[in-house]
């Protein structure tokens, strides 16, 4: 018995061969892939300008158009045919007939073209008897021959792995996905424009670092042949950006890629887009206000409303974002824990063990508190919420709080259970920063972590004086997930990280 998959594969291979032979014959008859094709419009402009015109109005207007795109559907009805052309903006129906383009061209060329071929069209706008806006083609030209049948001809591109690996096919056949990435571009453009309009200067810092720094993450290691040294793809631009604040810039941002040699999940991709911003002479509360304003403006501009649906939740951006300290949030979502438990090492260890947290030897109260928060609280932070007062132990670059030296002037923004942003008042005491770096080195040595290195150049820069400064980092991919209602980060990254095809 022949399996359905084998049958489909046989049909696919046969069609590949037929298309290849068609191209060979086309080349024998003088076809060469054209160098260009001048369009004067696209599908969305046509629909926007002429959708409301009547049949008679279009006859009077006699609108000539030149358009190009991919043929994705076709109905041949003897001496006349309808087909659908898809371009970047949408779709438009094309009508052609033997009388207009000659019998020879219609029968020996057009009818032998395939779904997936890229065509250039010149024609006149009209409406069919059913009222569908269409183009009556006077000239047809094949621009590119498709040698592979499109996936929707064989029930779509349903395999998730293939969707990511052959993103171009997914984009051709999935209009919803195509629009997600158009919206991604709009969101990034809006953020960039918003920052510039708020007097931020966009800067660029190195992607290749001599020392990994700016975040506690495992780096990708590469090698520079000329200088004969290992280098690291950046895990964060933070330390370079703060050196620019030392140098005199007061409002800067960078919107670019970071790389972290860590796990892949619905919320994590090793290569991801971040925006980091810094404001001199401000503190973390100022940056929280700025972050809330930025997010509300993005939602209003991109979504056109202040309440949006994400997964099964309705997210309200119309009200002030909620604010909780880390301890307050743990108590709120853990009725069996009281405040005194979080201040006692033995009690907090017992709580952590009871919920399955594996405690490392060097962990003190701050580390354990953060682990309890991540395990029991984060997933419950659905509406936009700022969490503040992070322990010093997990915030090595943040300024200590004036009233409690065990916590920092730091916040993280959570939406729909995802960490979207991280910000704080920057630590500008060079001695305190040096001691924290050295403490990190001791811990890394015990854990045999060779990726944690001491950044002497950054400490040297701090000694020249970093003004009071607040910083912010926003995970752009996660934000886009929420704005486009996607549950996997892979569905908002055009080419997510995958194993090599052979593996």
Swiss-Prot record:
Localization in the cell: Cytoplasm
GO BP: lysyl-tRNA aminoacylation
Binding-site list for Mg(2+) 1: 412, 419
Protein name stated in the entry: Lysine--tRNA ligase
Cofactor dependency: Mg(2+)
EC number(s) reported in the record: 6.1.1.6
Catalytic activity: tRNA(Lys) + L-lysine + ATP = L-lysyl-tRNA(Lys) + AMP + diphosphate
PROSITE patterns: AA_TRNA_LIGASE_II
Domain of life of the native organism: Bacteria
Xref: Gene3D superfamilies: Bira Bifunctional Protein, Domain 2, Nucleic acid-binding proteins
Record carries keyword Nucleotide-binding: yes
An example Gene Ontology CC term for this record: cytosol
Manner of cofactor binding, per the entry note: Binds 3 Mg(2+) ions per subunit.
InterPro entries: Aa-tRNA-synt_II, aa-tRNA-synth_II, aa-tRNA-synth_II/BPL/LPL, Lys-tRNA-ligase_II, Lys-tRNA-ligase_II_N, Lys-tRNA-synth_II_C, NA-bd_OB-fold, NA-bd_OB_tRNA
Record's keyword terms, sorted: Aminoacyl-tRNA synthetase, ATP-binding, Cytoplasm, Ligase, Magnesium, Metal-binding, Nucleotide-binding, Protein biosynthesis
Family to which the UniProt record says this protein belongs: Belongs to the class-II aminoacyl-tRNA synthetase family.
Organism: Buchnera aphidicola subsp. Schizaphis graminum (strain Sg)
Residues bound to Mg(2+) 2: 419
GO molecular function: ATP binding; lysine-tRNA ligase activity; magnesium ion binding; tRNA binding
Name of the encoding gene: lysS
NCBIfam families in the record: lysS_bact (TIGR00499), PRK00484.1 (NF001756)
Entries under SUPFAM superfamilies matching the protein: Class II aaRS and biotin synthetases (SSF55681), Nucleic acid-binding proteins (SSF50249)
